[in-house]
């Protein structure tokens, strides 16, 4: 497959083409097809952008109808029919059933735009500049969001100093027996700790890029209480693990919390169309008209597909229950796999349909597995500080047959990657279930 034009004309910054060195030409559901007709099972989902699969036929039909009717495509922040219907649907499907009140702000098209707006707003509301972020957190690669991102690879590329952020230990950072909330509270209580009082805390309930680190529900509850005690806003970055990835539409719902500000993007449009959104408590809406603008805020094509996604999948609990059923299938399979190779140092963590197979003993193992998986026809990536986590991110709509086939291919890839070092697998069948 000839990739020379990409090598010759595209910047060295390109990344995923190096992991998946083929030319993809088609995609449908959970399958990607390259120019030679080879099929790949997608366990990557555009880094969490395609929760409902590629070219979802329900969304595509509605989008084509809208285009054929000459619906408004570009409208800045003007009132359009597509935006009106989206706002009505958010209110009816997401807010009223939860008895929530949020004001919506449409930012630029990517997740980092939503984070930038959230941080700016928090600083305006509180009149303070410092933000608490967390170890292994990822919030984007533009100025303000990059300052809140912990990964050295991204921070080193900034070229300028990144300030006004204090990093604190995420849940479990020091192990399961250390309460990191108590550590943060001690820092906040001590006037000589050197910690400038923050305007807000920004947190992911599951750190996808950071290595599929999962905050416990109790920790999230305690974090919200901490924010309230110390007059800080709580911002939940739900860009990768929101829109149903953990089983509920918002990833924090199981904790019973209600953040002050929520950022959404990635799978919000449902179709891979750029769209980002900030939800804020109404009393926090202190923006002056036009104070945070952008040419591509409010993507009307994305409004169309996002509305359809909410109506199709989130008008009842049925889809949420289905995601949780698939979570159990994947989790059981991964636990079984980890126990099958007791000397490999494999561990499992995750929530919903973001699950990680962690190579605790040899970080490079995860990348070897990912490469072997791609050779066998599975698109999957790694994450974590040392790329030590094989991150499973299939579409929420993936068919069981395709899901189990992909898992079987990953199992074979694990065996390949370990074959030179590990003894034969001790295959365990938990509860008599087939993997």
Swiss-Prot record:
Its cofactor is pyridoxal 5'-phosphate. Pathway: Amine and polyamine biosynthesis; ectoine biosynthesis; L-ectoine from L-aspartate 4-semialdehyde: step 1/3. It is an enzyme of class 2 (transferase). GO terms for biological process: ectoine biosynthetic process. One of its GO terms (molecular function) is pyridoxal phosphate binding. Its EC number is 2.6.1.76. The keyword Zinc-finger does not apply. This is Diaminobutyrate--2-oxoglutarate transaminase. The gene is ectB.
